[in-house]
Amino acid sequence: MNQNSDTTHGQALGSTLNHTTEVTRISNSSDHFEDSSSNVDESLDSSNPSSNEKASHTNEEYRSKGNQSYVPSSSNEPSPESSSNSDSSSSDDSSVDRLAGDPFELGENFNLKHYLRAYKDSLQRDDIITRSSGVCMRDHSVYGVGSGYEFLKTFPDIFLQPYRAITEKQVVEKAILSHCHALANAGELVMVLGQPGSGCSTFLRSVTSDTVHYKRVEGTTHYDGIDKADMKKFFPGDLLYSGENDVHFPSLTTAETLDFAAKCRTPNNRPCNLTRQEYVSRERHLIATAFGLTHTFNTKVGNDFVRGVSGGERKRVTISEGFATRPTIACWDNSTRGLDSSTAFEFVNVLRTCANELKMTSFVTAYQASEKIYKLFDRICVLYAGRQIYYGPADKAKQYFLDMGFDCHPRETTPDFLTAISDPKARFPRKGFENRVPRTPDEFEQMWRNSSVYADLMAEMESYDKRWTETTPASSEAPEKDNFGSDISATTKHELYRQSAVAEKSKRVKDTSPYTVTFSQQLWYCLARSWERYINDPAYIGSMAFAFLFQSLIIGSIFYDMKLNTVDVFSRGGVLFFSILFCALQSLSEIANMFSQRPIIAKHRASALYHPAADVISSLIVDLPFRFINISVFSIVLYFLTNLKRTAGGFWTYFLFLFIGATCMSAFFRSLAGIMPNVESASALGGIGVLAIAIYTGYAIPNIDVGWWFRWIAYLDPLQFGFESLMINEFKARQFECSQLIPYGSGYDNYPVANKICPVTSAEPGTDYVDGSTYLYISFNYKTRQLWRNLAIIIGYYAFLVFVNIVASETLNFNDLKGEYLVFRRGHAPDAVKAAVNEGGKPLDLETGQDTQGGDVVKESPDNEEELNKEYEGIEKGHDIFSWRNLNYDIQIKGEHRRLLNGVQGFVVPGKLTALMGESGAGKTTLLNVLAQRVDTGVVTGDMLVNGRGLDSTFQRRTGYVQQQDVHIGESTVREALRFSAALRQPASVPLSEKYEYVESVIKLLEMESYAEAIIGTPGSGLNVEQRKRATIGVELAAKPALLLFLDEPTSGLDSQSAWSIVCFLRKLADAGQAILCTIHQPSAVLFDQFDRLLLLQKGGKTVYFGDIGEHSKTLLNYFESHGAVHCPDDGNPAEYILDVIGAGATATTNRDWHEVWNNSEERKAISAELDKINASFSNSEDKKTLSKEDRSTYAMPLWFQVKMVMTRNFQSYWREPSILMSKLALDIFAGLFIGFTFYNQGLGVQNIQNKLFAVFMATVLAVPLINGLQPKFIELRNVFEVREKPSNIYSWVAFVFSAIIVEIPFNLVFGTLFFLCWFYPIKFYKHIHHPGDKTGYAWLLYMFFQMYFSTFGQAVASACPNAQTASVVNSLLFTFVITFNGVLQPNSNLVGFWHWMHSLTPFTYLIEGLLSDLVHGLPVECKSHEMLTINPPSGQTCGEYMSAFLTNNTAAGNLLNPNATTSCSYCPYQTADQFLERFSMRYTHRWRNLGIFVGYVFFNIFAVLLLFYVFRVMKLRSTWLGKKITGTG
């Protein structure tokens, strides 16, 4: 038996699920765009038709054996159980035969059941203990806080919050789950059913004891006698909660994602002498084969923003990763979402197989589950508003509610029927039972507690408790080590369970540790994962490398070849300041990165894969080589271009402090992200930190000039110590030749150096050089002996910050779990909501805000059918027929030609509801996008016609498109969103009042009156899934689409009742005359009956069927059965049947080409003839419409009206998202005060004038975080425009750009003014200047234009960038570039000749010159004692006599303070601040010119926004259509 092999990787099928808890890994090798060729139909023990038999009697054979694991029979014979399950297909026989050969073969005939039995055989042979567990949860209640409703908080509410916190009644504690029970023996499957908000997710979390985020939890839970506290402490990896959302590192491939989970849970006691690497590889291939993912091994998992595997494949990656962690008890929260019915069945069937063979216990919530899936479960739990109304055998659940008095539709599936019980509008009592059935959750719960099924459950729980909590000593006869039979005692079970877990742990892992591998192994695995994440993201690596190289070349050329003289003394400080600041601040993006991966780390932490500290340390380590390379390139280029101290020691010291400074700041930003609860607060503190770091590094203002109230900040700034050491390294033991001695000019050439001085602070009289060490001490108070002391301090800061990050990662567990709640505008909420918010109200379910007493305070829709029918009569009735023929769609992927649609044809007519179906990846959404003219890449060929004529520019405006993703402006109310659509999409000839009246009709039709004034928001904070879907449909209906309504997966993610409600609504729309084409994923038989026609696609975008469905799908079923398909059972679901027939599913295949069957069928010929007839009838018709000018226009409304509507909506969006405005306001006020009091009350000394220069400079640098704050909102609005509004031609892109620019102006003026006041008056710019009112007004005016400048600059950058992250990088790069040439860091006179043009080109030259020259013009300079230059005159002359010629003939001469002295002449280099500004080429006389030029730059930016938006967002869309070949016949 292999005990060690502690190399790198892991084990098989999750040690086959904890040596009873892991199933399925990965194995395929084709690109994920291709059809999978692996056949896993027979890999699933219930995938054959006969397997339904086994499922129907819910595995009684297994349950009759209690917890006894399967004991394999001879490997050469099929087991009796196998025979009893009637798996009698020939393929099954061949699988059994193959068991005698290589049972671990993962070929095309792979059989999961046989694999697992062979695997258990090998465990027995190697004497490996396995473990399994059941669960008993008794009287469990979960409480949270919140009413389920909130009032919208606008910007002013931030200031009113303290008052309302006092006056408004505090929200009371609410019950999410109330006195629920759960019991599952090892190896059982439990389905949890209920409407959204019933508490299903909370129930699953409770089963896995994942309840730390709730307010309070009551009740007891144990796992075969192991207390939940002990289970979470010692065996947390045995409990899995797999959430609904797919949370992964998007840059990792599928194989890398699964490998990592398997490595971290690889047991030490592996069967068959497998090494860790062999184990991990086998696990990966096994899980992937079971879930049909092998072809995605080398494809990135991706996410909504990173292209990767498809949505259905990503869901399967989530499931596979869960299996790789080897849980004994797994809870799967709506894990079938996004999967087609066949793939969903395959997933649950794998759970069934693992339950049977490995005793893995699973709880599953699933929406729209099929009958076939339902039959695989042992127990059913039904929840109603947090109340448990049934928990018992699956085969008794339906009858329980039938006996209660409810009726079930003949073709309604059992899961749909059970879910409908909790919906008052969907449940139907039988005749005579109307007043006898329960109505409220309390009544249902009470009836359940009085039932015999409840009594049976209590008796079974009592027996379970007695069995697994007894303390009888273990039997003297040792039980089998690979099973926990029903005859063993609780003590023996617990000891064996502990032994099994301990045996899996690597050496040096404590027996009580929850982790499987050592910390060093965890660290190694995390290092490998971090490396893979970097390598798989070449765009990030490339952008960072480019940024470092670009900046080094720019700065190096600006400060090119500095001389060892006093002219470049100031410039050397500028180079060193920029070097360390730039390298350090490149880590600012770490904040966003840390928050993006926080949910992933939390998920892995819950599964005990690794210490979070291992990930913290690994990410810091992996970052080092990339930082080393980037800073190496930066240092080499910049150091030698600028001619810094050219010694080996000087260069390596420079490099060392840049590297350690950047590394320390990376740890600072990471630790900041680790201790903050959300990204907004971390980013705000990060922005403030950047400002403090930049100011207190020591270059902008020497620390000795900072007031005592802020001076301590410098000692918290690691870069201050780094900058000090860089300055010491550069200046120590060096003498800088004086470029010009004072006095100079005619008559002074013959005087010796002894009578002159260098005009530099710290210069000694009578010397022609400046000593570097003295300069540092006099100017900065730097002492050369502190160089290496500073290194130790920075390392100490780094160690402390890493420690903080590690402690935060291990101890802090931020509450990211929020219940769903509606948000209403104040004064517009229903009365019940006002009561719920202001008075505590009724107990509401925090998952959706439903009244836990059974009502729903937001459902007040009228039930008057007659009234609703009148509203349907107002729907625009269509008369046009949309048809397409021979439609092909080709794209290029990595240079390879792919055809996504292949010769598709069909038509949609008014009054008919047409379904578009197919498995995942068949091209449903692609076809919908092509038909709706919404694809922007590739080549489309074929005919798309309206009434036999080609499409015109009005097509998109006259159609509605309901996207699968509900894309909205989250801050709009439902009514506002519909009014916006109606106002801009209905013809201009229709009065606005009439448009709004129609909106009210649509709201009534969709039964949205009760939440019409609710904010759409985001999922969790706003409308729930069904409400958002209704709002999306409403937005399209409000436009009165005269031609066609497209809908993409309108029922995706909805429970069965919500899906039924949506489809019934579509049915009524079609009956009212609307033409509808709708894709649908998992329709039940009843749902499917609502459709008139079907277009069925198979992989490759090939048509399998198009035509009528027929009553009860008879026409459709007859077609397939007449062409050789097996007969569809009378109680079967036709939608599932046709998908099974054509081989849909992740692992399914078919031996027949149904596309070829269709092409050769009479039905296809009939459709072609029908298309010819339709087109001919319209082409021959004399009644051809002549569209008016209004009808022919691309947009329904004029540009001015578009701008008005979009601007109003954007302003509302800003006003209703107070976090954006508050962060902007807080940054302006805080930064203004911070800079103001840092440079507080500057006097008239030379250093004071320079400090004022940097005070102005820092005021302009503030634009960087402000731009970073406005770009995400701009991109958010732009994404809505691009995804939904632009394709529908709602309004012009010009309207979008102008509205985005205009809406920023009032906020910039108000907040900019507040910054100006907080910045201007503490520095006391107004002191000592003439006409302070005029100059203050000028400075304010120029700064207000600067507010407009940076906002339009940021919008221009955002227009060209795909996302906010990229925009932030580009923005920082460009902003740094333009701000570098303004003459502050390097005066224009010192610039290399090549760059002089850039000084004149950058707008910051005119901004800073305008502000500073205005604010210091005419100020007298009063040198302080250390700023005075001491000159010794020749013997016999007074200071005045000696200096008179110099002072008279030189306009730039300073001020001589003691003209009568004969020694030690005190000379101040400047008389006025204007002379100081001349050094930077700044003049007061340019101020109005500067204002005019800067205003010109503002208008240039506006033009740039328009141009870049057109080039990157509009022209791109249009240019791609040039590649399309779409023909028409009209």
Swiss-Prot record:
Residues 153-410, 882-1125 form the ABC transporter domain. One of its GO terms (biological process) is response to antibiotic. The modification Phosphoserine is found at residues 486, 489. ATP binds at residues 918-925. Its main location: membrane. Residues 1-100, 843-864 are annotated as: Disordered. InterPro entries: AAA+_ATPase (IPR003593), ABC2_TM (IPR013525), ABC_trans_N (IPR029481), ABC_transporter-like_ATP-bd (IPR003439), ABC_transporter-like_CS (IPR017871), ABCG_dom (IPR043926), ABCG_PDR_1 (IPR034001), ABCG_PDR_2 (IPR034003). Residues 1-26 have a biased composition (Polar residues). GO terms for molecular function: ABC-type transporter activity; ATP binding; ATP hydrolysis activity; ATPase-coupled transmembrane transporter activity. Residues 54-64 have a biased composition (Basic and acidic residues). Keywords: Antibiotic resistance, ATP-binding, Glycoprotein, Membrane, Nucleotide-binding, Phosphoprotein, Repeat, Transmembrane, Transmembrane helix, Transport. Glycans are attached at residues 28, 67, 273, 334, 450, 1159, 1175, 1449, 1460. It is a multi-pass membrane protein. SMART domains: AAA. Belongs to the ABC transporter superfamily. ABCG family. PDR (TC 3.A.1.205) subfamily. PANTHER family: ATP-BINDING CASSETTE TRANSPORTER. This is Brefeldin A resistance protein. It comes from Schizosaccharomyces pombe (strain 972 / ATCC 24843) (Fission yeast). The gene is bfr1.
